[in-house]
C-alpha cells in the first residue's frame, strides 16, 4: 500500500500514526495492497480555500476527500479487490484540535486526526453520512476501525468519539 503523508500545515502532527491508521483502515476494508493514497495536512487558511472552492461553504473544515478511481471494497470474501488510485485526504490540525477539545470524550489533536483520516478513507470508498442510515453505517464502521487499530497498538482509554457530522 503506497500512502504518502505530506504536512504543509506548519503544525507538528503524528504523521506516522496517520499513515498507520490509514493503512489499517485500507487493509480492514480489503483494498488492494498496491493501491495509492495521499494525505495532505494543511493550515486553516488553505482548508478554508478548499472548502469554498469545492463545497461552496465558508470557513475551514476538518477533513475533505477527493476520490480518484472510485475504488470500492470487494462485496464478497472471494472477490479480488481492485487496484488503483484512491485519491487525496486533506486534514486540518487547527480544526481537529478544537474538535478534540469539544468532543464528548475529550482527546488530543492527533487522536482527532487519526479519526478524521479513517473518516476520509471511508469517504474515498464511497461511504457518506447525508442520510441517517448512511450515517449509522459509516460512523459504526469508523468506530470499529479506530477501535481495532487502537487495540492492535495497545492504546488504552476511550476511543475518540466522532466529532464529524
From Swiss-Prot:
A Gene Ontology term for the protein's cellular component: cytoplasm
Name of a matching Pfam family: YbeY
Cofactors (names): Zn(2+)
Subcellular location: Cytoplasm
Entry's cofactor comment: Binds 1 zinc ion.
GO molecular function: metalloendopeptidase activity; RNA endonuclease activity; zinc ion binding
Keywords: Cytoplasm, Endonuclease, Hydrolase, Metal-binding, Nuclease, Ribosome biogenesis, rRNA processing, Zinc
InterPro entries: MetalPrtase_cat_dom_sf_prd, YbeY, YbeY_CS
GO biological process: rRNA processing
Enzyme Commission number(s) from the entry: 3.1.-.-
PROSITE patterns: UPF0054 (PS01306)
List of residues binding Zn(2+): 119, 123, 129
Family matches, as HAMAP family: Endoribonucl_YbeY
Family indicated by similarity: Belongs to the endoribonuclease YbeY family.
PANTHER family the record matches: ENDORIBONUCLEASE YBEY, CHLOROPLASTIC
Function text: Single strand-specific metallo-endoribonuclease involved in late-stage 70S ribosome quality control and in maturation of the 3' terminus of the 16S rRNA.
Name of the protein: Endoribonuclease YbeY
Organism: Streptomyces avermitilis (strain ATCC 31267 / DSM 46492 / JCM 5070 / NBRC 14893 / NCIMB 12804 / NRRL 8165 / MA-4680)
The encoding gene: ybeY
